[in-house]
Amino acid sequence: MMLTIDIDTARRFILGKQGLWPGRRWRGMEGTEQAMRAMEYLQLDPLQIIARSHDIALHSRVLDYTPGMWEDVTYRQRTFFDWGGWLAARPMDELPHWRVVMRRERESNSRMRSIARDHADTIAEMRAILRERGTVSNRDFAMATRTRTQSYRGRKDSALALYYLWLTGKVMTHHRERFERVYALTETVAPAHLIR
């Protein structure tokens, strides 16, 4: 038997599922986490014209939301992690499922295999530096000391190596500075039971 609903009910259901109806119902830091969980996938926007789109999306759902609250629940509380070509914050407890996709990027993505082959020494160097320092940003490496690349992902071999390690799940975003990723080895960011 097919269930029939009217358009208003369907609209309210869809808006309610995304946290947009009936109005902003969450509040503060806890509400930010609840809204992000309801959205399931918060696309992060590096561009800021008036405000970053992820802050606008959360402001429309969370009372008392201020820009950057998503960073607290993502990077300080480690409730979410960011990842992917369409950069998004995802619930940390979903990491085991995403690690399958990360492994697929490493094994099946021809661009990633090409980066791994062409920049193997730099990738190994970045992993060693991360083991030594704990965290690292691409800005930590001056252009004068790096090999220039022709990739839209970065002008330096260090940028390409860090991007490769991040997309294939070997490193994660530890935190951000002026929206730029500061990387750390995955085992120092994610709870151990999620990366076995």
Where are these regions (language model features)?
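Long, low-complexity intrinsically disordered regions
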Residues: 1-196
